[in-house]
Amino acid sequence: MAFTQKTIIRNVSPMDVVRCFHSHKFIEFLTLGQPVKIESWKGIDNNKEASFSFWFFGWRKMSVVHENYILNREYLSFEDKGLILPFGLQGWTHRHIVKPYESGALIIDQIHLEE
């Protein structure tokens, strides 16, 4: 199963968005008010891992490793590959892309699940 979401951020440079992706405080901000616990987060560079728990009729654990990190002046791309997955999932790949768009930035999330 595949899912793609695109988010346009106006009047913000792509590099400002990229800096946010590298900030642990930004990750905490994204999960604020959600039933999510960040267990560990090492960063988004290649081979760095992240693990967290989220509430869905009980706490569920998920762990990923980051791969295929690409960064240049106005572009970022990296993937989360599932290590520990909930709900019997066999595979999880989440590709993050940040690139210029009109007077701002475009964030593209491409998620592929294997059941």
Model-identified regions with their sequence ranges:
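Glycine-rich portal/gate segments that line the openings of hydrophobic small-molecule binding cavities
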Residues: 25-29, 38-86
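Solvent-exposed residues in well-ordered beta-strands and their adjoining turns
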Residues: 8-13, 55-57, 99, 112-114
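Hydrophobic/aromatic beta-strand elements that line small-molecule binding cavities or substrate pockets
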Residues: 5-7, 62-70, 93-100, 111
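Residue-level signal for beta-strand positions within conserved beta-sheet cores that form or flank
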Residues: 34, 62, 103
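Intrinsic-disorder/low-complexity, polar/charged segments enriched in Ser/Thr/Lys/Arg/Asp/Glu/Gln
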Residues: 1-6, 75, 91-93, 106-108
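A short, structured loop/turn motif at beta-sheet edges
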Residues: 11-15, 43, 68-75, 97-108
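Beta-strand/loop substructures that line and gate deep hydrophobic ligand-binding cavities in soluble
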Residues: 82-115
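Hydrophobic ligand-binding cavity/cleft-lining segments
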Residues: 1-48
